[in-house]
């Protein structure tokens, strides 16, 4: 028993810096990439072996059909491609030169586009191993593979039946403050079905609102018992409470809907102004999704190929801040790119950004990137213990006979 405790303790001394489950777009023709497990667009793209399919949707901003082929790779817990596996180890069917056949052109839209859809599993390939997966899409007509690389999409597959049991609880009583600015995540993990003899066999990832920029990797438990680990007062699991995400719905090109101040037509584009976001000195409950988005219009029929694209204008009223201010949400794919960075107007004391976006419901927040690369909440956004944050926990395990990490447990606390 003492030897087991030593192994478990050593496990949480290992740190990882490359962890990231982030989609990435390489070609500006690609817009509105969505990866959803089943129909649960409000959560991480997670499904189980034999469970609901993973849906990948995206738009190509042309009206021409492109032969898009895809390749699926299994990744370890650190999101590195598992080179020690054969494709037959994690997949049945074919993985080379598979074409995305489900495509439909937009109908009566100002900006023509072609919508593509892919579901995994499908008739050509079925996944047979739990863990992390990365799909890369290529334009088959490109001169070479690097030029034809369009985007990558990531998702997670759990075991058909969890091999661990997770209990999660969030409290506003923390070692930093009580019912003020922070939340403490408490966890209990029952791993009695697993045989752990080496510190690298178990990896635990904790996310707040699906964000990977502040992910906590392998937090050290403060209680160990036979087959169980407990995190009750772990400093690493104290999170800034933040505030509820902001939101808007752009559903109609003629009439402003929720969160929209004005819609104008300039002869070539719809210019949509989101209501100015002002400082929030007090907490106000709001059921906004935690960065999620959902494509639809007021008719809510054939949303994939009838929704318009428009220039969406964001305005944030705030003093000049010491770091760069970014829009952050699932639809920014966790990336701090120039297109999501806001510019400051000294005359109006406001930040501004303009993005080319498709009709739908969007939730978002503002984050600040400091010169040292650290990410912080904006002081003007508020920090309140009552905030309804979402916490996700991923538990990876590699048995002695395994050549990669499997996802043996997944928990979500809303």
Residues covered by each model-derived region:
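Bacterial Sec-dependent N-terminal signal peptides
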Residues: 1-22
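Short acidic/polar inter-strand loop motif in beta-rich domains
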Residues: 77-79, 125, 139-150, 211-212, ...
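Aromatic-rich carbohydrate-binding modules that target alpha-glucans
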Residues: 91-116, 212-219, 224, 311-359, ...
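Long, internal scaffold/assembly segments composed of regular secondary structure
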Residues: 197-283
């Amino acid at each position: 028993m003492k030897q087991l405790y030593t192994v478990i303790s050593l496990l949480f001394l290992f740190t990882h810096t490359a962890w990231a489950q982030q989609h990435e777009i390489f070609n500006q023709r690609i817009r509105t990439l969505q990866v959803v497990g089943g129909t649960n667009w409000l959560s991480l793209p997670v499904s189980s072996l034999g469970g609901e399919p993973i849906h990948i949707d995206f738009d190509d901003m042309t009206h021409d059909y492109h032969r898009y082929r895809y390749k699926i790779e299994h990744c370890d817990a650190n999101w590195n491609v598992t080179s020690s596996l054969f494709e037959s180890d994690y997949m049945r069917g074919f993985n080379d030169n598979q074409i995305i056949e489900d495509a439909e052109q937009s109908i009566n839209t100002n900006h023509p586009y072609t919508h593509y859809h892919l579901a995994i599993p499908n008739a050509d390939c079925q996944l047979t191993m739990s863990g992390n997966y990365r799909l890369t899409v290529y334009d088959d007509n490109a001169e070479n593979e690097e030029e034809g690389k369009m985007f990558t999409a990531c998702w997670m597959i759990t075991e058909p039946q969890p091999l661990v049991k997770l209990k999660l609880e969030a409290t506003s009583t923390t070692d930093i403050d009580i019912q003020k600015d922070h939340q403490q995540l408490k966890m209990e993990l029952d791993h009695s079905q697993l045989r752990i003899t080496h510190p690298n066999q178990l990896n635990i990832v904790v996310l707040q609102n699906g964000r990977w920029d502040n992910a906590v990797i392998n937090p050290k438990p403060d209680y160990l018992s036979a087959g169980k680990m407990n995190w009750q007062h772990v400093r690493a699991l104290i999170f800034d409470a933040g505030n509820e995400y902001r939101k808007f719905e752009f559903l109609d090109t003629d009439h402003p809907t929720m969160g929209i101040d004005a819609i104008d037509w300039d002869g070539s584009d719809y210019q949509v102004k989101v209501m100015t976001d002002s400082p929030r000195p007090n907490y106000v409950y709001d059921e906004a999704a935690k960065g999620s988005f959902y494509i639809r219009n007021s008719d809510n029929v054939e949303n994939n190929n009838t929704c318009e694209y428009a220039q969406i204008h964001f305005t944030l009223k705030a003093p000049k801040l010491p770091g760069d201010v970014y829009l952050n949400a699932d639809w920014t794919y966790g990336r701090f790119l120039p297109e999501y960075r806001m510019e400051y107007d000294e005359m109006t004391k406001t930040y501004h950004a303009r993005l080319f976006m498709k009709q739908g419901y969007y939730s978002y927040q503002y984050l600040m990137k400091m010169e040292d690369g650290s990410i912080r909440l904006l002081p003007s956004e508020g920090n309140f213990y009552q905030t309804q944050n979402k916490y996700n926990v991923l538990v990876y395990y590699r048995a002695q006979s395994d050549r990669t990490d499997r996802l043996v447990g997944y928990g979500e606390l809303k």
